Protein backbone atom coordinates (compact mmCIF):
# COMPACT_ATOMS: atom_id res chain seq x y z
CA UNK A 1 0.00 0.00 0.00
CA UNK A 2 1.18 3.47 -0.83
CA UNK A 3 0.63 6.90 0.62
CA UNK A 4 -2.66 7.48 -1.23
CA UNK A 5 -3.78 4.05 -2.49
CA UNK A 6 -5.02 1.48 0.02
CA UNK A 7 -6.14 -2.05 -0.79
CA UNK A 8 -9.15 -0.67 -2.66
CA UNK A 9 -8.24 2.64 -4.26
CA UNK A 10 -7.91 6.04 -2.60
CA UNK A 11 -10.25 6.49 0.38
CA UNK A 12 -10.94 9.01 3.10
CA UNK A 13 -13.49 11.33 4.66
CA UNK A 14 -14.96 13.28 1.74
CA UNK A 15 -14.05 16.99 1.62
CA UNK A 16 -11.62 16.52 4.52
CA UNK A 17 -9.13 13.81 3.52
CA UNK A 18 -10.47 13.04 0.06
CA UNK A 19 -10.92 16.60 -1.18
CA UNK A 20 -12.06 18.00 -4.52
CA UNK A 21 -8.47 19.19 -5.04
CA UNK A 22 -7.11 15.66 -4.58
CA UNK A 23 -9.80 14.25 -6.90
CA UNK A 24 -8.78 16.79 -9.58
CA UNK A 25 -5.11 15.82 -9.24
CA UNK A 26 -6.03 12.12 -9.33
CA UNK A 27 -7.93 12.76 -12.55
CA UNK A 28 -4.88 14.36 -14.13
CA UNK A 29 -2.33 11.84 -12.85
CA UNK A 30 -4.50 8.76 -13.40
CA UNK A 31 -5.65 9.92 -16.82
CA UNK A 32 -2.05 10.52 -17.89
CA UNK A 33 -0.58 7.24 -16.59
CA UNK A 34 -3.40 5.09 -17.99
CA UNK A 35 -3.34 6.69 -21.44
CA UNK A 36 0.36 7.26 -22.15
CA UNK A 37 0.60 3.97 -24.08
CA UNK A 38 -1.95 5.21 -26.65
CA UNK A 39 -0.75 6.08 -30.18
CA UNK A 40 0.02 9.78 -30.57
CA UNK A 41 -3.10 11.79 -31.31
CA UNK A 42 -5.51 9.16 -29.94
CA UNK A 43 -7.77 10.58 -27.26
CA UNK A 44 -8.15 8.54 -24.06
CA UNK A 45 -11.71 7.48 -23.19
CA UNK A 46 -12.53 7.21 -19.47
CA UNK A 47 -15.80 5.97 -17.90
CA UNK A 48 -16.92 7.28 -14.50
CA UNK A 49 -19.52 5.76 -12.19
CA UNK A 50 -20.50 6.57 -8.62
CA UNK A 51 -22.60 5.30 -5.75
CA UNK A 52 -25.36 7.29 -4.03
CA UNK A 53 -23.30 9.27 -1.48
CA UNK A 54 -23.94 13.01 -1.29
CA UNK A 55 -20.21 13.67 -1.84
CA UNK A 56 -20.23 11.73 -5.11
CA UNK A 57 -21.32 14.76 -7.15
CA UNK A 58 -18.51 16.95 -5.79
CA UNK A 59 -15.80 14.34 -6.37
CA UNK A 60 -17.17 13.41 -9.79
CA UNK A 61 -17.05 17.05 -10.93
CA UNK A 62 -13.47 17.50 -9.72
CA UNK A 63 -12.29 14.18 -11.15
CA UNK A 64 -13.84 14.99 -14.51
CA UNK A 65 -12.16 18.42 -14.55
CA UNK A 66 -8.79 16.74 -14.02
CA UNK A 67 -9.41 14.21 -16.78
CA UNK A 68 -10.62 16.86 -19.23
CA UNK A 69 -7.54 18.97 -18.51
CA UNK A 70 -5.33 16.08 -19.63
CA UNK A 71 -7.33 15.75 -22.86
CA UNK A 72 -9.53 12.74 -22.03
CA UNK A 73 -13.01 12.02 -23.34
CA UNK A 74 -15.16 11.28 -20.28
CA UNK A 75 -18.36 9.21 -20.31
CA UNK A 76 -20.50 9.63 -17.19
CA UNK A 77 -22.36 6.45 -16.24
CA UNK A 78 -24.23 7.98 -13.29
CA UNK A 79 -25.14 5.75 -10.33
CA UNK A 80 -23.94 2.24 -11.12
CA UNK A 81 -22.19 -0.60 -9.28
CA UNK A 82 -18.41 -1.00 -9.20
CA UNK A 83 -18.53 -4.21 -11.29
CA UNK A 84 -20.75 -2.36 -13.76
CA UNK A 85 -17.95 0.17 -14.33
CA UNK A 86 -15.37 -2.63 -14.66
CA UNK A 87 -17.50 -4.52 -17.22
CA UNK A 88 -18.30 -1.45 -19.33
CA UNK A 89 -14.67 -0.29 -19.31
CA UNK A 90 -13.65 -3.56 -20.94
CA UNK A 91 -16.66 -4.03 -23.23
CA UNK A 92 -16.57 -0.46 -24.58
CA UNK A 93 -12.79 -0.57 -25.15
CA UNK A 94 -12.28 2.39 -22.84
CA UNK A 95 -8.80 3.45 -21.76
CA UNK A 96 -9.81 3.35 -18.11
CA UNK A 97 -12.76 3.28 -15.73
CA UNK A 98 -13.18 5.07 -12.40
CA UNK A 99 -15.62 4.29 -9.59
CA UNK A 100 -16.39 6.86 -6.91
CA UNK A 101 -17.43 4.92 -3.81
CA UNK A 102 -16.32 3.86 -0.34
CA UNK A 103 -18.18 0.56 -0.67
CA UNK A 104 -19.56 -0.57 2.74
CA UNK A 105 -18.01 2.36 4.68
CA UNK A 106 -20.14 5.08 6.36
CA UNK A 107 -21.63 7.90 4.26
CA UNK A 108 -19.00 10.48 5.30
CA UNK A 109 -16.30 8.44 3.56
CA UNK A 110 -15.76 8.19 -0.15
CA UNK A 111 -13.19 6.69 -2.47
CA UNK A 112 -11.79 6.74 -6.00
CA UNK A 113 -10.93 3.43 -7.63
CA UNK A 114 -9.37 3.00 -11.09
CA UNK A 115 -9.74 0.14 -13.57
CA UNK A 116 -7.42 -0.49 -16.51
CA UNK A 117 -8.65 -1.06 -20.07
CA UNK A 118 -8.93 -4.80 -19.31
CA UNK A 119 -11.51 -4.13 -16.57
CA UNK A 120 -9.17 -5.19 -13.76
CA UNK A 121 -8.08 -3.06 -10.81
CA UNK A 122 -4.65 -1.46 -11.19
CA UNK A 123 -1.52 -3.31 -10.12
CA UNK A 124 0.79 -1.90 -7.44
CA UNK A 125 3.33 -0.58 -9.96
CA UNK A 126 0.71 1.49 -11.83
CA UNK A 127 -0.68 2.89 -8.57
CA UNK A 128 2.85 3.82 -7.51
CA UNK A 129 3.37 5.66 -10.80
CA UNK A 130 0.24 7.73 -10.11
CA UNK A 131 1.41 8.39 -6.54
CA UNK A 132 4.82 9.59 -7.77
CA UNK A 133 3.11 12.19 -9.97
CA UNK A 134 0.87 13.31 -7.09
CA UNK A 135 3.96 13.75 -4.90
CA UNK A 136 6.03 15.61 -7.49
CA UNK A 137 7.04 19.14 -6.50
CA UNK A 138 5.52 20.48 -9.72
CA UNK A 139 2.75 19.33 -12.09
CA UNK A 140 4.57 18.96 -15.43
CA UNK A 141 1.85 16.91 -17.14
CA UNK A 142 0.56 18.11 -20.53
CA UNK A 143 -2.03 20.90 -20.58
CA UNK A 144 -3.73 20.70 -23.99
CA UNK A 145 -5.66 23.68 -25.34
CA UNK A 146 -8.35 24.31 -27.94
CA UNK A 147 -9.57 21.22 -29.78
CA UNK A 148 -7.20 18.98 -27.80
CA UNK A 149 -9.06 19.53 -24.53
CA UNK A 150 -11.28 16.72 -23.32
CA UNK A 151 -15.08 16.65 -23.40
CA UNK A 152 -17.75 14.94 -21.33
CA UNK A 153 -20.94 13.08 -22.27
CA UNK A 154 -23.55 11.01 -20.42
CA UNK A 155 -23.88 7.29 -21.09
CA UNK A 156 -26.63 6.29 -18.67
CA UNK A 157 -27.71 3.44 -20.98
CA UNK A 158 -24.49 1.70 -19.94
CA UNK A 159 -26.34 0.29 -16.93
CA UNK A 160 -28.83 -1.45 -19.23
CA UNK A 161 -25.99 -2.97 -21.26
CA UNK A 162 -24.48 -4.29 -18.02
CA UNK A 163 -27.81 -5.79 -16.83
CA UNK A 164 -28.19 -7.48 -20.22
CA UNK A 165 -24.82 -9.19 -19.72
CA UNK A 166 -25.84 -10.39 -16.24
CA UNK A 167 -29.06 -11.91 -17.60
CA UNK A 168 -27.11 -13.82 -20.24
CA UNK A 169 -24.99 -15.61 -17.60
CA UNK A 170 -27.90 -17.86 -16.56
CA UNK A 171 -29.68 -20.48 -18.63
CA UNK A 172 -33.15 -20.35 -17.10
CA UNK A 173 -35.48 -17.79 -15.61
CA UNK A 174 -36.48 -17.56 -11.95
CA UNK A 175 -40.23 -18.00 -12.41
CA UNK A 176 -41.67 -19.39 -9.16
CA UNK A 177 -38.89 -17.99 -6.97
CA UNK A 178 -39.68 -15.24 -4.47
CA UNK A 179 -36.46 -13.24 -3.96
CA UNK A 180 -36.07 -10.47 -1.38
CA UNK A 181 -33.41 -7.84 -2.13
CA UNK A 182 -31.56 -5.35 0.08
CA UNK A 183 -29.79 -2.71 -1.99
CA UNK A 184 -28.17 -0.85 0.96
CA UNK A 185 -29.62 2.42 -0.42
CA UNK A 186 -26.58 2.20 -2.68
CA UNK A 187 -25.43 1.65 -6.24
CA UNK A 188 -27.70 -1.35 -6.95
CA UNK A 189 -30.86 0.54 -5.91
CA UNK A 190 -31.97 1.30 -9.45
CA UNK A 191 -30.69 -1.97 -10.91
CA UNK A 192 -31.21 -5.12 -8.83
CA UNK A 193 -35.02 -5.17 -8.72
CA UNK A 194 -35.12 -4.62 -12.49
CA UNK A 195 -32.62 -7.45 -13.10
CA UNK A 196 -34.48 -10.07 -11.05
CA UNK A 197 -37.91 -8.95 -12.29
CA UNK A 198 -36.66 -9.28 -15.88
CA UNK A 199 -35.65 -12.85 -14.98
CA UNK A 200 -39.29 -13.50 -13.91
CA UNK A 201 -38.67 -13.68 -10.14
CA UNK A 202 -41.25 -12.41 -7.68
CA UNK A 203 -39.26 -9.53 -6.13
CA UNK A 204 -39.60 -7.76 -2.76
CA UNK A 205 -37.15 -4.97 -1.93
CA UNK A 206 -35.75 -2.99 1.00
CA UNK A 207 -32.85 -0.51 1.13
CA UNK A 208 -33.97 0.82 -2.22
CA UNK A 209 -34.57 4.52 -1.46
CA UNK A 210 -31.23 6.37 -1.49
CA UNK A 211 -31.27 10.01 -0.36
CA UNK A 212 -27.53 10.70 -0.44
CA UNK A 213 -27.13 10.15 3.30
CA UNK A 214 -28.57 6.71 4.09
CA UNK A 215 -26.18 4.41 2.19
CA UNK A 216 -25.32 1.29 4.28
CA UNK A 217 -27.25 2.71 7.26
CA UNK A 218 -28.57 -0.37 9.07
CA UNK A 219 -29.05 -2.13 5.72
CA UNK A 220 -27.06 -4.04 3.10
CA UNK A 221 -24.52 -6.85 3.33
CA UNK A 222 -22.96 -5.48 6.54
CA UNK A 223 -26.38 -5.54 8.29
CA UNK A 224 -28.00 -8.75 6.97
CA UNK A 225 -30.24 -9.11 10.04
CA UNK A 226 -32.57 -6.49 8.50
CA UNK A 227 -33.05 -8.57 5.35
CA UNK A 228 -33.34 -11.79 7.40
CA UNK A 229 -36.37 -10.34 9.17
CA UNK A 230 -37.82 -9.17 5.82
CA UNK A 231 -37.38 -12.65 4.26
CA UNK A 232 -39.30 -14.25 7.14
CA UNK A 233 -41.99 -11.58 7.00
CA UNK A 234 -42.50 -11.99 3.23
CA UNK A 235 -42.06 -15.78 3.16
CA UNK A 236 -39.42 -15.39 0.45
CA UNK A 237 -37.38 -18.32 -0.89
CA UNK A 238 -34.15 -16.40 -0.45
CA UNK A 239 -32.73 -12.95 0.26
CA UNK A 240 -29.81 -11.17 -1.41
CA UNK A 241 -28.06 -8.29 0.38
CA UNK A 242 -25.63 -6.06 -1.52
CA UNK A 243 -23.23 -3.44 -0.17
CA UNK A 244 -23.01 0.25 -1.08
CA UNK A 245 -21.14 -0.22 -4.36
CA UNK A 246 -22.62 -3.59 -5.30
CA UNK A 247 -19.46 -5.69 -5.33
CA UNK A 248 -20.50 -7.93 -2.41
CA UNK A 249 -23.31 -10.38 -1.72
CA UNK A 250 -24.50 -11.91 1.54
CA UNK A 251 -27.49 -14.24 1.12
CA UNK A 252 -30.33 -15.21 3.46
CA UNK A 253 -32.03 -18.60 3.29
CA UNK A 254 -35.79 -19.17 3.48
CA UNK A 255 -35.60 -19.51 7.29
CA UNK A 256 -33.93 -16.13 7.70
CA UNK A 257 -30.46 -17.58 8.36
CA UNK A 258 -27.36 -15.90 6.95
CA UNK A 259 -25.47 -17.56 4.09
CA UNK A 260 -22.08 -15.84 3.93
CA UNK A 261 -19.46 -15.65 1.19
CA UNK A 262 -17.82 -18.94 2.23
CA UNK A 263 -21.10 -20.84 1.90
CA UNK A 264 -21.99 -19.14 -1.39
CA UNK A 265 -18.51 -20.01 -2.77
CA UNK A 266 -18.93 -23.62 -1.66
CA UNK A 267 -22.43 -23.92 -3.18
CA UNK A 268 -21.39 -22.32 -6.48
CA UNK A 269 -18.07 -24.21 -6.59
CA UNK A 270 -19.72 -27.60 -6.08
CA UNK A 271 -22.36 -26.84 -8.72
CA UNK A 272 -19.76 -25.67 -11.26
CA UNK A 273 -17.57 -28.69 -10.46
CA UNK A 274 -20.46 -31.09 -11.10
CA UNK A 275 -21.09 -29.33 -14.43
CA UNK A 276 -17.39 -29.58 -15.37
CA UNK A 277 -17.06 -25.78 -15.35
CA UNK A 278 -14.74 -25.27 -12.35
CA UNK A 279 -11.16 -24.93 -13.65
CA UNK A 280 -8.92 -27.56 -11.99
CA UNK A 281 -11.74 -28.06 -9.44
CA UNK A 282 -10.17 -25.16 -7.56
CA UNK A 283 -11.67 -22.26 -5.58
CA UNK A 284 -9.46 -19.31 -4.59
CA UNK A 285 -10.30 -18.01 -1.09
CA UNK A 286 -8.50 -15.89 1.52
CA UNK A 287 -7.06 -16.55 4.96
CA UNK A 288 -10.40 -15.36 6.42
CA UNK A 289 -12.35 -18.35 5.07
CA UNK A 290 -13.73 -20.65 7.76
CA UNK A 291 -12.12 -24.03 8.53
CA UNK A 292 -15.51 -25.57 7.75
CA UNK A 293 -15.26 -24.21 4.20
CA UNK A 294 -11.93 -25.98 3.67
CA UNK A 295 -13.27 -29.27 5.06
CA UNK A 296 -16.42 -29.15 2.88
CA UNK A 297 -14.43 -28.23 -0.25
CA UNK A 298 -12.04 -31.14 0.34
CA UNK A 299 -14.91 -33.56 0.98
CA UNK A 300 -16.52 -32.55 -2.32
CA UNK A 301 -13.30 -33.37 -4.20
CA UNK A 302 -12.29 -29.76 -4.77
CA UNK A 303 -9.23 -27.73 -3.75
CA UNK A 304 -9.22 -24.38 -1.93
CA UNK A 305 -6.26 -22.04 -2.30
CA UNK A 306 -5.60 -19.18 0.15
CA UNK A 307 -4.47 -15.61 -0.50
CA UNK A 308 -4.07 -12.49 1.64
CA UNK A 309 -7.29 -10.63 2.52
CA UNK A 310 -8.62 -8.44 -0.29
CA UNK A 311 -10.41 -9.35 -3.50
CA UNK A 312 -7.51 -7.91 -5.54
CA UNK A 313 -5.26 -10.71 -4.24
CA UNK A 314 -7.89 -13.32 -5.02
CA UNK A 315 -8.20 -11.96 -8.56
CA UNK A 316 -4.39 -11.93 -9.02
CA UNK A 317 -4.20 -15.63 -8.13
CA UNK A 318 -7.19 -16.44 -10.36
CA UNK A 319 -5.70 -14.60 -13.34
CA UNK A 320 -2.36 -16.37 -12.92
CA UNK A 321 -3.95 -19.80 -13.48
CA UNK A 322 -7.28 -18.83 -15.11
CA UNK A 323 -9.28 -20.22 -12.17
CA UNK A 324 -13.00 -19.60 -12.63
CA UNK A 325 -14.22 -19.01 -9.05
CA UNK A 326 -12.84 -17.19 -6.06
CA UNK A 327 -13.91 -14.90 -3.27
CA UNK A 328 -14.04 -13.85 0.34
CA UNK A 329 -16.16 -14.70 3.36
CA UNK A 330 -17.29 -11.04 3.35
CA UNK A 331 -19.17 -11.64 0.09
CA UNK A 332 -16.79 -10.54 -2.67
CA UNK A 333 -17.25 -13.34 -5.22
CA UNK A 334 -15.47 -13.41 -8.56
CA UNK A 335 -16.72 -15.48 -11.51
CA UNK A 336 -13.84 -14.93 -13.91
CA UNK A 337 -15.75 -16.31 -16.92
CA UNK A 338 -18.12 -13.35 -16.63
CA UNK A 339 -16.45 -10.59 -14.60
CA UNK A 340 -13.10 -9.08 -13.64
CA UNK A 341 -14.03 -8.13 -10.07
CA UNK A 342 -16.39 -9.00 -7.21
CA UNK A 343 -20.01 -8.62 -8.33
CA UNK A 344 -22.96 -8.89 -5.96
CA UNK A 345 -25.71 -9.03 -8.58
CA UNK A 346 -23.80 -11.56 -10.71
CA UNK A 347 -23.28 -13.74 -7.62
CA UNK A 348 -26.97 -13.37 -6.83
CA UNK A 349 -28.17 -14.60 -10.22
CA UNK A 350 -25.72 -17.54 -10.09
CA UNK A 351 -27.00 -18.56 -6.64
CA UNK A 352 -30.65 -18.16 -7.65
CA UNK A 353 -30.04 -20.31 -10.74
CA UNK A 354 -28.62 -23.10 -8.55
CA UNK A 355 -31.65 -22.97 -6.22
CA UNK A 356 -34.01 -23.04 -9.22
CA UNK A 357 -32.24 -25.73 -11.27
CA UNK A 358 -31.58 -28.12 -8.35
CA UNK A 359 -35.04 -27.63 -6.85
CA UNK A 360 -33.40 -27.55 -3.41
CA UNK A 361 -33.92 -24.96 -0.69
CA UNK A 362 -31.03 -22.59 -0.02
CA UNK A 363 -30.88 -23.82 3.59
CA UNK A 364 -30.28 -27.41 2.36
CA UNK A 365 -27.49 -26.32 0.02
CA UNK A 366 -25.84 -24.21 2.74
CA UNK A 367 -26.10 -26.96 5.39
CA UNK A 368 -23.53 -29.06 3.49
CA UNK A 369 -20.80 -26.73 4.78
CA UNK A 370 -20.15 -26.93 8.54
CA UNK A 371 -19.14 -23.70 10.26
CA UNK A 372 -16.56 -23.57 13.01
CA UNK A 373 -17.40 -20.91 15.62
CA UNK A 374 -15.55 -17.76 14.61
CA UNK A 375 -15.14 -14.45 16.39
CA UNK A 376 -13.79 -11.24 14.88
CA UNK A 377 -13.06 -8.08 16.86
CA UNK A 378 -11.97 -4.74 15.37
CA UNK A 379 -9.78 -2.52 17.55
CA UNK A 380 -9.19 1.14 16.64
CA UNK A 381 -5.49 1.82 17.12
CA UNK A 382 -3.07 4.74 17.03
CA UNK A 383 -0.72 2.98 14.59
CA UNK A 384 -1.73 -0.30 12.99
CA UNK A 385 1.79 -1.19 11.78
CA UNK A 386 3.25 -0.76 15.27
CA UNK A 387 0.39 -2.79 16.73
CA UNK A 388 0.97 -5.65 14.26
CA UNK A 389 4.64 -5.88 15.24
CA UNK A 390 4.29 -5.24 18.97
CA UNK A 391 6.36 -7.58 21.10
CA UNK A 392 3.58 -8.31 23.62
CA UNK A 393 1.03 -8.75 20.83
CA UNK A 394 3.19 -11.30 18.97
CA UNK A 395 3.97 -13.19 22.19
CA UNK A 396 0.26 -13.42 23.10
CA UNK A 397 -0.60 -14.72 19.62
CA UNK A 398 2.09 -17.42 19.90
CA UNK A 399 0.82 -18.40 23.34
CA UNK A 400 -2.77 -18.78 22.07
CA UNK A 401 -1.67 -20.81 19.02
CA UNK A 402 0.34 -23.17 21.23
CA UNK A 403 -2.76 -23.69 23.40
CA UNK A 404 -4.87 -24.53 20.33
CA UNK A 405 -2.44 -27.26 19.26
CA UNK A 406 -3.74 -27.23 15.69
CA UNK A 407 -7.43 -27.49 16.60
CA UNK A 408 -8.42 -24.01 15.48
CA UNK A 409 -6.64 -20.93 14.21
CA UNK A 410 -5.89 -17.29 14.95
CA UNK A 411 -5.56 -14.47 12.45
CA UNK A 412 -4.49 -10.95 13.39
CA UNK A 413 -4.24 -8.40 10.60
CA UNK A 414 -4.39 -4.69 9.89
CA UNK A 415 -7.34 -3.25 7.96
CA UNK A 416 -6.38 -2.09 4.49
CA UNK A 417 -8.68 0.94 4.59
CA UNK A 418 -9.12 2.02 8.25
CA UNK A 419 -6.91 2.49 11.39
CA UNK A 420 -8.04 -0.89 12.74
CA UNK A 421 -6.44 -4.13 13.83
CA UNK A 422 -8.70 -7.16 13.29
CA UNK A 423 -8.36 -10.12 15.68
CA UNK A 424 -10.04 -13.34 14.57
CA UNK A 425 -10.17 -16.81 16.12
CA UNK A 426 -11.80 -20.11 15.12
CA UNK A 427 -12.14 -22.94 17.61
CA UNK A 428 -14.37 -25.95 18.35
CA UNK A 429 -16.56 -23.88 20.72
CA UNK A 430 -17.76 -20.27 20.84
CA UNK A 431 -16.43 -19.97 24.40
CA UNK A 432 -12.91 -20.83 23.27
CA UNK A 433 -13.17 -18.30 20.41
CA UNK A 434 -14.20 -15.58 22.86
CA UNK A 435 -11.35 -16.43 25.20
CA UNK A 436 -8.63 -16.41 22.53
CA UNK A 437 -9.86 -13.22 20.86
CA UNK A 438 -10.27 -11.34 24.14
CA UNK A 439 -6.82 -12.39 25.31
CA UNK A 440 -5.14 -10.89 22.22
CA UNK A 441 -7.50 -7.91 21.85
CA UNK A 442 -6.85 -6.84 25.42
CA UNK A 443 -3.09 -6.57 24.77
CA UNK A 444 -3.67 -4.65 21.51
CA UNK A 445 -6.01 -2.23 23.32
CA UNK A 446 -3.67 -1.73 26.27
CA UNK A 447 -0.58 -1.07 24.14
CA UNK A 448 -1.97 0.61 21.01
CA UNK A 449 -5.71 1.29 21.43
CA UNK A 450 -7.02 4.79 20.74
CA UNK A 451 -8.77 4.75 24.12
CA UNK A 452 -5.93 2.89 25.84
UniProtKB/Swiss-Prot annotation:
GO molecular function, one term: phosphomannomutase activity
Post-translational modification note: Activated by phosphorylation.
Location of Phosphoserine modifications: 103
UniProt-listed SUPFAM superfamilies: Phosphoglucomutase, C-terminal domain (SSF55957), Phosphoglucomutase, first 3 domains (SSF53738)
Pfam families: PGM_PMM_I, PGM_PMM_II, PGM_PMM_III, PGM_PMM_IV
Catalyses which reaction(s): alpha-D-glucosamine 1-phosphate = D-glucosamine 6-phosphate
GO biological process: carbohydrate metabolic process; peptidoglycan biosynthetic process; UDP-N-acetylglucosamine biosynthetic process
E.C. code: 5.4.2.10
Xref: InterPro entries: A-D-PHexomutase_a/b/a-I (IPR005844), A-D-PHexomutase_a/b/a-I/II/III (IPR016055), A-D-PHexomutase_a/b/a-II (IPR005845), A-D-PHexomutase_a/b/a-III (IPR005846), A-D-PHexomutase_C (IPR005843), A-D-PHexomutase_C_sf (IPR036900), A-D-PHexomutase_CS (IPR016066), Alpha-D-phosphohexomutase_SF (IPR005841)
Positions annotated to bind Mg(2+): 103, 243, 245, 247
Entry cofactors: Mg(2+)
Gene Ontology CC terms: cytosol
Keyword Metal-binding: yes
Domain of life: Bacteria
Active site: 103 (phosphoserine intermediate)
Cofactor: how and how many bound: Binds 1 Mg(2+) ion per subunit.
UniProt KW keywords: Isomerase, Magnesium, Metal-binding, Phosphoprotein
UniProt record similarity statement: Belongs to the phosphohexose mutase family.
PANTHER family listed in its UniProt record: PHOSPHOGLUCOMUTASE (ALPHA-D-GLUCOSE-1,6-BISPHOSPHATE-DEPENDENT), PHOSPHOHEXOSE MUTASE
Its biological purpose: Catalyzes the conversion of glucosamine-6-phosphate to glucosamine-1-phosphate.
Protein name from the UniProt record: Phosphoglucosamine mutase
Amino acid sequence: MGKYFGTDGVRGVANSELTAELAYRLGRAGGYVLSKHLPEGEQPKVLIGRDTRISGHMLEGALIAGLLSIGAEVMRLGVISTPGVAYLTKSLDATAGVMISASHNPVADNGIKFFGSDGFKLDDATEQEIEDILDAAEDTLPRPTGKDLGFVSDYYEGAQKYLQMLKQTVEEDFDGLHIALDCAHGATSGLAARLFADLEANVSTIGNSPNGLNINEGVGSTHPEHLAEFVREKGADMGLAFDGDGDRLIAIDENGDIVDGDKIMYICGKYLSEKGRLKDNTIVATVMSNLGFHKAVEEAGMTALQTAVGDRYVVEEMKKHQYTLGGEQSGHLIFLDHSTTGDGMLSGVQLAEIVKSTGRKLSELAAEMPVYPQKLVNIRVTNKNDAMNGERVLATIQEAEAEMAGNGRILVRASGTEPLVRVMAEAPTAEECDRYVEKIAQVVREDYGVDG
